[in-house]
């Protein structure tokens, strides 16, 4: 009787993802496989060897190496997906409680939104270095473009701008987006476009427009790493002590709107989220001062009126 192997199953699944152009997902599965192989200490992992005790030990192994709970969840869900497919194909034994006690959820992380003053410094601090000014303009534009994700910003095309409106589809979900280009955005974008490659379809120079397939994915991940390094340098130059990444811009946009009383439904639509639950993860909790003031006002609106009647 043939013995089927999880590692081989994952490699086949990764190959299928690459064929579909889902390079980010393929990398996630490859990372999970590499980690599980290191834990097992061998290249072949028979499905018949995998049981709940083994997965619990693997979970402890990851935590001992200071992996976050979200990393644990990601790796375990990748294993569960491939094991489930093997089970459907009769290649792995049925096990109802295989993942019982294994963390498969999402731990809410510390929110990435920046304090308003830090955000203001990043946007407005005078800078001498041309590269830092370029990063500053990009940050301002991403904020002006409704907290646009870097992946969408980098992939904006010249043809996406028509009649003063930016029309594009989100890279992650395909959601169609419309953003009116404000006058200040035109100035910032014109300054960035001076560097745009003449023959490139892209609005900005993060991507060359000459790569396809997995090469294009690698070019994008390199551009993201470069941009995050530039943001770190910008923060240092502006005296901002918080960690600043491309995610900070998006989270800060959402939290600023929340603090201004904008309904979460509108914030969700502006961000292009398909679920309000996703938006809630982005939003930083209100400050204690703000919550105390609202609580006090709520009480007084009733108590003071009752006191007058009494």
Predicted regions and their residues:
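N-terminal core-binding DNA-recognition domain of tyrosine recombinases/integrases
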Residues: 12-24, 33-110, 125
